[in-house]
Amino acid sequence: IMFKGTDKFGTSNYEAERPYLKQIEKLYEEYRHITDPAKRKVWYHKIDSVSQIAAQYNIPNEYDKLMAAIGSQGTNAYTSNDVTCYVENIPSNEIDSWAKVQGDRFQNMVIRGFHTELEAVYEEYNMGLTSDGRKLFTALMAKLFPNHPYGTQTTIGRGEHLKNPSIVNIKNYFHKYYVPNNIAICLSGDLDPDKTITTIEKYFGSWKPSTHI
């Protein structure tokens, strides 16, 4: 989701795209409260139809193209029990270009292409169900930490979570935890510390901390 862009990139026309994204968000909120299988199928067809319209404004992989344009390599992300980490290997003379894009996406993330991303996560979840190692680790953590998120919640979530997704909840999570007082920017390499700090302040300095952390 974090690689899909903002209101400034990842879209050919955000003002035209936004109403459809809002509609998709609303449809998902209604979908997650429907229990009848036949009605859920009809509702998901609605979501798919609106998503296809919204996709007309989507510019696929624009984030990757922006990073490639500045010579970045190793674009990646991972989530563990304690951290979600985003990784880039960039030329030292492209710090400003990198920070401009990162400052935008971490403050102004737009959720687009949600249903296709959800399907990819669900496929990963299903693969985990057939992995003996994954099942053993999950059972071990549940025994070791019965009253702690380490044992009660896996990073990918449960099947019922994926079957009843909420873009509203994702946005709430983003606004609560993707905040400067809960994030560390780690840089190493051929850097001028003073210039780098000035650049970080330029693109991240207006980011408001959360009072809920």
What are these model-predicted stretches?
Residues 10-213:
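Charge-rich, well-structured scaffold segments of protease-associated domains
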